[in-house]
From Swiss-Prot:
Belongs to the cytochrome P450 family. Hydroxylates (-)-(4S)-limonene to (-)-trans-isopiperitenol, a precursor of (-)-menthol. No activity with (+)- or (-)-piperitone, (-)-isopiperitone and piperitenone. It comes from Mentha gracilis. It is a single-pass type II membrane protein. It catalyses: (4S)-limonene + reduced [NADPH--hemoprotein reductase] + O2 = (1S,6R)-isopiperitenol + oxidized [NADPH--hemoprotein reductase] + H2O + H(+). Its cofactor is heme. This is Cytochrome P450 71D95. PANTHER family: CYTOCHROME P450 71D8 (PTHR47953:SF16), OS08G0105600 PROTEIN (PTHR47953). One of its GO terms (cellular component) is endoplasmic reticulum membrane. One of its GO terms (molecular function) is iron ion binding. Its EC number is 1.14.14.99.
Length: 497
């Protein structure tokens, strides 16, 4: 009995002391004018609130209660979620470059060669130099148009496959990924590389572990968690396989004389600049490998993800599909080839793509990191704090969008919004200094294939599924990919019938 009483007293005292500590912790935070957030648990912070949910969904719920600038404690990591266009504009434009860093994760550090790339590199001379080379040599509007014959060639290959599969179930997730990968390989590297399908799968797996939610990311001071992190071993196995593939690409380019265009491709340019004594930051071989992996990560995953979400939403909304196909078939009738200039006429289809990116942004949570202490919406954001811009949440906010949960492309006829980085409630490609440099290239790789898929085929869901039966869930990870593959049945369209 005495032991039970003593135990009860100890528990009561411990609870009282813990409550005092928590109150003192909250008081000290409020005195610092930090952003508001839900009550935290010791050690884990707010991790329990993310359990069983996708982070962008859980953080959207928090913003409804605590406001558009929300403090989220992820283990040891002080994080801030921005969920309004005003706060996002302040962080991505007015405070740029104070918020222009990327936060590091175990996934990006291992798979992207210590972040020696463009996507995950900190804001630095190296990042500026590599981005400039990328834009001028690969991703300019002129170059995007010059790649038209590659898009046409690879699209013809896909159309032939779909024609031969008429009436059969086709895994469109697999086919669109292959199409996008082939276009990117030929445009960037001069040819379709060996093991490209395996590399695409490695990219997908890498991005799923690059969001910064591994235990070793959330408790960086714990040597034990870092040592016991099972995914770390998996990442290193993946990295060794990636390195083997990328090393082969590098060696092949050292030996070859010219690419598909009969001249330099982007890797040849990087090798040439590697030898240039005038460049500001030396370009290492690892930086070239990281750039190649970037090209697959940003190009293949985001373009194919958007195309698949467009097709999924069209299948779920037959009236929208019918309207989009009517426009495409009227505008493209009689044309033997289709490319960037042709799709500019397709206003409704372009609105369909916009509406898809509103509801299914390629990167639901854009990752940033503070380079210095700053202030957003009057709240103090500490140096090195992790910042996550909830693009998914802003795309479904009724303050900015009428009927936000309805797929309604016509909204863009009524409200002039684009995704070029100036409308901060709609930034699927990011904004500010770190806006996606491949915006034009990626958009062309979505719109041109989409127009031809809508023109040449009528589509049905597999196995008699109804539109209302479709699973529109997203998978976990940095990119907002579909949780399940998209299975469709194509029927060739006869313009003369």
């Amino acid at each position: 009995m005495e032991l039970q009483i003593s135990s009860a007293i100890i528990i009561l005292v411990a609870t009282f002391v813990a409550s005092l500590l928590i109150k003192q912790w909250r008081k000290s935070e409020s005195q610092q004018n930090l952003p508001p957030g839900p009550p935290k648990l010791p050690l884990v912070g707010h991790l329990h609130l993310l359990w069983g949910k996708l982070p962008q969904h859980a953080m959207a719920d928090m913003a409804k209660k605590y406001g558009p600038v929300t403090h989220v404690q992820l283990g040891e990591v002080f994080s801030v979620v921005l969920s309004s266009r005003e706060a996002t504009k302040e962080a991505m434009k007015l405070l740029d470059p104070a918020c222009a860093d990327r936060f590091e994760s175990i996934g990006t550090r291992i798979m992207w060669y210590d972040n020696d790339d463009i996507i995950f590199s900190p804001y630095s001379d190296h990042w500026r130099q590599m981005r400039k080379i990328c834009v001028s040599e690969l991703l300019s509007a002129r170059n995007v148009r010059s790649f038209g014959f590659i898009r046409q060639d690879e699209m013809s290959r896909l159309l032939r496959h779909l024609q031969s599969s008429a009436g059969e179930t086709v895994d469109m997730t697999e086919r669109i990924a292959t199409l996008t990968c082939s276009i990117i390989c030929r445009a960037a590297f001069g040819a379709i590389i060996n093991d490209h399908e395996e590399l695409v799968e490695l990219v997908k797996d890498s991005l799923s572990m690059a969001s910064g939610f591994e235990l070793a990311d959330l408790f960086p001071s714990s040597k034990l968690l870092n040592l016991l992190c099972w995914n770390k071993s998996k990442l290193w196995r993946m990295r060794r396989r990636v390195d083997t593939i990328l090393e082969a690409i590098v060696e092949e380019h050292k030996l070859k004389k010219s690419g598909e265009f009969g001249g330099e491709d982007i890797i040849d340019v990087l090798f040439r600049m590697q030898k240039d004594s005038q460049i500001k930051v030396p370009i290492t071989t690892n930086a070239i490998k990281a750039f190649i992996f970037d090209t697959f990560s940003a190009g293949t995953e985001t373009s194919s993800t958007t195309t698949l979400w467009v097709m999924a939403e069209l299948m779920r909304n037959p009236a929208v599909m019918a309207k989009a196909q009517a426009e495409v078939r009227a505008a493209l009738k009689g044309k033997t080839s289709v490319d960037v200039d042709d799709v500019q006429e397709l206003k409704y289809m372009k609105s369909v793509v916009k509406e898809t990116m509103r509801m299914h942004p390629p990167i639901p949570l854009i990752p940033r990191s503070c380079r210095e202490e700053c202030e957003v919406n009057g709240y103090k954001i500490p140096n090195k704090a992790r910042i996550m811009i909830n693009v998914w949440s802003m795309g479904r906010n009724p303050l900015y969008w009428e009927k936000p949960e309805t797929f309604w492309p016509e909204r863009f006829d009524q409200v002039s919004r684009d995704f070029m980085g100036s409308d901060f409630e709609f930034i699927p490609f990011g904004a500010g200094r770190r806006i996606c440099p491949g915006l034009n290239f990626g958009l062309a790789n979505v719109e041109v294939p989409l127009a031809q898929l809508l023109y040449h085929f009528d589509w049905k869901l597999a196995e008699g599924m109804k539109p209302s039966d479709m699973d529109m869930s997203e998978a976990e990870g940095l990119t907002g990919i579909r949780k399940n593959n998209l299975l469709l049945v194509p029927t060739p369209y006869n313009p003369s019938s």
